[in-house]
Curated annotation (Swiss-Prot):
Keywords: Chromosome, Coiled coil, Cytoplasm, Methylation, Nucleus, Phosphoprotein. Residues 1-26, 110-202, 385-476, 622-736, 853-905, 937-966, 982-1020, 1082-1119 are annotated as: Disordered. It is found in: Nucleus; Chromosome; Cytoplasm. It comes from the Eukaryota. Residues 389-407, 435-447, 663-678, 695-736, 874-900, 1002-1011, 1088-1102 have a biased composition (Low complexity). This is Ubiquitin-associated protein 2. Residues 168-182 have a biased composition (Basic residues). Residues 651-662, 679-694, 943-957 have a biased composition (Polar residues). Residues 105-130 form a coiled coil. It comes from Homo sapiens (Human). The keyword Cell membrane does not apply. PANTHER family: UBIQUITIN ASSOCIATED PROTEIN 2-LIKE/LINGERER, UBIQUITIN-ASSOCIATED PROTEIN 2. The modification Omega-N-methylarginine is found at residue 166.
Length: 1119
């Protein structure tokens, strides 16, 4: 069937080619030829192939011992002559030439690659015959077989300018797709067969198909490769044919197609192709990363153009804007930048690094991410920024790539002044070779030229000035403002000073980074592939590290700039993330500015304005720097000691910078500001935590942020596009909780730009900088409260935010956000429908959890009706209370189990929001309580301890304060955190539970006041548990969510940012008021009372009263 079908298709295809050929330049003539050839081939391949061809193949396999593919190809080449095929197989390519004779003219076209063509034709025949044989033997289907031929023919056609010749060749090879005929059967030049993308897409299913295209493209040489490239619309057009081939291979998933059948043959052929195309192909294959390294390294003068091209290419792959702008910067040597072009060139390495590292790292963080991530992490961990200056060169030498190493080596000497080298190093991370060369040349050309971009140069200067000394800061400001070169000198001193300390650290981690490229190189195993491998390896390694350490990658640059070890770490890492955003968002930002923001806390804001400076480069940047540096100088004067207090200084700086930034409020400035401000805000909070702690938490933050930043940078870019509107930036950031700090910065920036509100709230934000993010989430509507709220949020952010906040949109959202909205919906149903009754899963969960605790408790929840009525009736609650009290004691002991009571249903509901309480019930039951309960208690407590405690700073934010405060936070806008915290056991339940009363029964326990607690017991179990639990249902989902995500605590905290549930987030702003009132009634009261339990009774009343109607009722959720 397949054979006949295939043949039919082929014939149909032949007919089509005639039509399409008629349409195409060389119509029927070629079509007729191709048709005849194809007819013969089709008969041989299809009609005969099923029996004859396959028998022949078997015979060949037996006689020659070759594999089936080789035999098929040989038969194909020999037109079914078994003896001839045996000779070919045994003797080698003897008949390949004769077979090519069909495509002799093609040879003429590609005599250069005649051998390659032979191999290619042979291969394509192999593959095409494979396709045919597969069609016949494997039943792949005629279409695929034809596609193979078409591809082969198409390739041949591409190579063979003469369609007739190509058609002949195609006929010789097999029924030509009409490709040989020019347009070929498919009038559109290969309905995809012609285009590499179409090739791999349509024929990707056929291993051979894409391979044919790729290999043939490489083999075909300039003619075919160029045609394919042009058709493909790949960068390959601009590059050599082999480069285009490399692109095709890289873009076309050639690796997959190289995998099995074709690999051996293709490998040798690849070697052949590699020899001729190694340098050029490497340009494209690496995904442009290799292009930068290999090409740029090889031709230093050419590297400038190559840089533009390679960067542009990488732009195509990765973040176009960042790379493009970087190209402009790099090209600033040749292109814009004028006064600052040299400075930009010296800075451009930085901006390139940051842009490439951040934007490029984010988008295509192959090398950059690898290098910068490890390097930056090392540097971040090695607090002193100066280390990075020298270290980057060393680290990035090994880290960026073996090839890059040379550039790196060059760069350290290149650092004519530490600033230049510093910039070089910064630029090193990703485009190190090119940047190193460019920066070297440029720096050599304009060591002092760095001065021209006061913003950019000043930024490095600032970073370095910071490194230099607090004492220098006044002069540093002057220097920065006056001459970056002067600051460069100072910087060179200061930078070199820290370098000795930290170089070793960076070097230590360099090998891993270098290992990654090495392994990546190893991946393909072929010369061409090696270049490609570097790209892939870098991409793969870079992708993960760059995501986790993506902020870090810029951070290395940042850390270079930042002299203070703790400060540099915490600052650089968050800033790095923001830098990523900025660089990605603002390619024109020169991310040098962004780097500046990274290097300096206020500098981050500063850099935001320098980013804006790109437009109003000198003025805004100078102003930003001037006011900025004054604070920076003061804060920097005590770099080590003020570190923690530096946040305060930073907030001032931030205030200054946003103010200054406001004027240059360019789109880049905005995006830069959000990220930088957020970094600034974030870092202070981190610095508050502790330099060392922050560095690891920051690493986590940067990891989560980095991943978030990816989206953030995209959104940030939107924000930038949005222009200076802080609200829009915030919305982009806030939607991207991932922009946690970024969002915080956004909100902060907004308020900063707004004016005083930032100054007061920014101080809070600096301490609460992370908190700013949740604030940001809700901050676009109101920043002041969110910023204030951020006080608690920041701790949540470090722990919870990275996983939950960002993940919800980035990683978590797939499961989390949908779950939240759905879960919120379920919660709405739960609240509205009294889930206990509607969803037995929750009652089951509760009884299960309660069952382990107390059967009577289970009764309370089970008699959801009674309990509900109990809500209404204190009498019902009284009995409920009695069980509740046992539950209380048990819930105290088992309040984790109690949490399952809340969570178990919720987790199922949460995780199986659709199924939740029915199907999810059992799993919620077992899965929820077990999985969720321990996570709830452990993670949530952990969250409360780590996150709630810092955020709440209430002793053992464990359950009591943590939960109460969690609600406070929730009210304040850390919705998810609040939910997760307070919601942990249940709104009132959580506080009570934290009080140790009992998760839900804690309310009853809390007062044990029969009347109220009874109500609480019943209400809590039902109204509370269900209403609250509904509310908590929100919280448990964070926990369930965390459990699901595996980062329960953080996730719950992460929820705090308000992402956890959009509903929560929604509720947060809207709910922030009504729900805040309710929650604040019980939660704040709990928090105020300081004892979740005792306060809870009174708060519970309002909660029972207000919450029942408002909170317990759907209205809460509705809100």
């Amino acid at each position: 069937m397949m054979t006949s079908v295939s043949s039919d298709h082929c014939r149909g295809a032949r007919e089509k080619p005639q039509i399409s050929a008629a349409q195409s330049t060389q119509p029927q003539k070629q079509v007729v030829q191709a048709t005849a050839e194809q007819m013969r081939l089709a008969q041989v391949i299809f009609d005969k192939n099923d029996s004859d061809f396959e028998a022949k193949v078997k015979q060949l396999m037996e006689v020659t011992g070759k594999n089936q593919d080789e035999c098929i190809v040989a038969l194909h080449d020999c037109n079914g002559d078994v003896n001839k095929a045996i000779n070919i197989l045994l003797e080698g390519n003897s008949d390949t030439t004769s077979w090519e004779t069909v495509g002799c003219k093609k040879k003429n076209f590609a005599k250069e690659n005649s051998e390659n063509k032979e191999n290619r034709e042979k291969k394509s025949e192999k593959e095409s015959s494979r396709g045919r044989g597969n069609n016949n033997r494997k039943g792949r289907g005629g279409n695929r077989g034809r596609e193979f031929r078409g591809e082969e023919n198409g390739i041949d056609c591409n190579q063979v300018d003469k369609p007739s010749d190509r058609g002949k060749r195609a006929r010789g090879r097999g029924f030509g797709r009409g490709r040989g005929r020019g347009a070929g059967r498919f009038s559109t030049q290969g309905m995809g067969t012609f285009n590499p993308a179409d090739y791999s897409d349509s024929t990707s299913t056929d291993v051979c198909g894409t391979k044919l295209v790729v290999w043939e493209a490489a083999q075909n040489g300039a003619d075919e490769g160029t045609e394919l490239a042009s058709n493909t619309h790949n960068i390959a057009q601009d590059l050599s044919n082999k480069s285009s081939y490399g692109l095709k291979g890289a873009w076309k998933n050639s690796v997959e197609e190289w995998t099995t059948e074709d690999w051996t043959e293709d490998l040798s052929e690849t070697k052949v192709f590699t020899a001729s195309s190694a340098p050029a192909e490497n340009h494209i294959l690496p995904g442009q990363s290799i292009d930068l390294v290999a090409l740029l390294q090889k031709p230093v003068p050419h590297s400038q153009a190559s840089e533009a091209n390679s960067f542009e290419t990488s732009q195509q792959q990765g973040f176009g804007q960042a790379l493009v702008f970087t190209n402009s910067q790099h090209n600033n040597q040749m292109a814009p930048g004028t006064g600052s072009s040299t400075a930009v060139n010296s800075c451009s390495p930085q901006s390139l690094s940051s842009v490439l590292g951040s934007g490029f790292g984010e988008l295509a963080p192959p090398k950059m991410a690898n290098i910068t991530s490890s390097q930056i992490l090392d540097q971040l961990k090695a607090p002193s920024l100066g280390q990075f200056t020298t270290t980057p060169s060393t680290q990035q030498n090994s880290t960026s790539h073996p090839t890059t190493t040379t550039s790196w080596d060059l760069k350290p000497p290149t650092s004519q002044s530490s600033v230049l080298s510093h910039l070089d190093f910064k630029s090193q991370p990703e485009p190190s070779p090119v940047l190193s060369q460019l920066s070297q040349r440029q720096q050599h050309q304009s060591q002092a030229v760095t001065v021209p971009p006061p913003g950019l140069e000043s930024f490095p200067s600032q970073a370095k000035l910071r490194e230099s000394t607090p004492g220098d800061s006044p002069s540093t400001v002057n220097k920065l403002l006056q001459l970056p070169s002067t600051t460069i000198e100072n910087i060179s001193v200061s930078v070199h000073q820290p370098q000795p300390k930290h170089i070793k650290l960076a070097k230590r981690r360099i090998p891993p980074a270098s290992k990654i490229p090495a392994s990546a190189v190893e991946m393909p195993g072929s010369a061409d592939v090696t270049g490609l491998n570097v790209q892939f390896g870098a991409l793969e390694f870079g992708s993960e590290p760059s995501l986790s350490e993506f902020g870090s990658a810029p951070s290395s640059e940042n850390s270079n700039q930042i002299p203070i070890s703790l400060y540099s770490k915490s600052l650089s890492e968050p800033l790095n993330t923001s830098l990523s955003m900025t660089s990605a968002v603002q390619n024109s930002t020169y991310t040098t500015s962004v780097i500046t923001s990274c290097s300096l806390t206020s500098s981050s804001l500063n850099s935001a304005s320098p980013v804006a400076m790109s437009s109003s480069y000198d003025q805004s940047s100078v102003h930003n720097r001037i006011p900025y540096q004054s604070p920076v100088s003061s804060s920097e004067s005590a770099p080590g000691t003020i570190m923690n207090g530096h946040g305060g200084g930073r907030s001032q700086q931030t205030l200054d910078t946003p103010k200054t930034t406001g004027p240059p409020s360019a789109l880049p400035s905005v995006s830069s500001l959000p990220s930088t401000t957020s970094c600034t805000a974030l870092l202070p909070s981190t610095s508050q935590h502790t330099g060392d702690l922050t560095s690891s938490p920051l690493s986590q933050l940067s990891s989560s942020l980095s991943s978030h930043q990816s989206s953030l940078s995209a959104h940030a870019a939107l924000s930038s596009s949005t222009s200076h509107t802080h609200a829009s930036v915030e919305s982009a950031s806030s939607h991207q909780s991932s922009a946690t700090f970024s969002t915080a910065a956004t909100s902060v920036s907004s308020s900063a730009s707004s004016g005083a509100s930032l100054s007061s709230s920014m101080n809070t934000a600096n301490s609460l900088c992370l908190g700013g993010t949740p604030a940001s989430a809700s901050s676009s509507s109101s920043r002041a409260a969110p910023l204030v709220t951020s006080g608690k949020a920041p701790p949540n952010l470090p722990q919870g935010v990275p996983p939950l906040l960002h993940n919800q949109y980035l990683v978590g959202p797939g499961g989390l956000l949908p779950a939240y909205p759905i879960y919120g919906y379920d919660e709405l149903q739960m609240l509205q429908s009294r889930l206990p009754v509607d969803y037995y899963g929750i009652p089951f969960a509760a009884p299960t959890a309660l069952a382990s605790r107390d059967g009577s408790l289970a009764n309370n929840p089970y008699p959801g009706d009674v309990t509900k009525f109990g809500r209404g009736d204190s009498a019902s609650p009284a009995p409920a209370t009695t069980p509740a009290q046992p539950q209380q004691s048990q819930s105290q002991t088992h309040h984790t189990a109690q949490q399952p009571f809340v969570n178990p249903a919720l987790p199922p509901g949460y995780s199986y929001t659709g199924l939740p309480y029915y199907t999810g019930m059992p799993s919620a039951f077992q899965y929820g309580p077990t999985m969720f309960v321990p996570p709830a208690s452990a993670k949530q407590h952990g969250v409360n301890l780590s996150t709630p405690t810092p955020p709440f700073q209430q002793a053992s934010g464990y359950g009591q304060h943590g939960y109460s405060t969690g609600y406070d936070d929730l009210t304040q806008g850390t919705a998810a955190g609040d939910y997760s915290k307070g919601g942990y056991a249940g709104s009132s339940q959580a506080p009570n539970k934290s009080a140790g009363s009992g998760p839900g029964k804690g309310v009853s326990v809390s007062s044990s006041t029969t009347g109220l607690p009874d109500m609480t017991g019943s209400v809590y179990n039902k109204t509370q548990t269900f209403d609250k639990q509904g509310f908590h249902a929100g919280t448990p989902p964070p926990f369930s969510l965390p459990s699901v995500l595996g980062s329960t605590g953080p996730l719950a905290s992460g929820a705090a940012p308000g992402y956890a549930p959009p509903p929560f987030l929604h509720i947060l702003p809207a709910h922030q008021q009504p729900h805040s009132q309710l929650l604040h009634h019980h939660l704040p009261q709990d928090a105020q009372s300081g004892s979740g339990q005792r306060s809870q009774p009174s708060s519970l009343q309002p909660k029972s009263q207000a919450s029942k109607p408002a909170y317990g009722n759907s209205p809460y959720w509705t809100n």
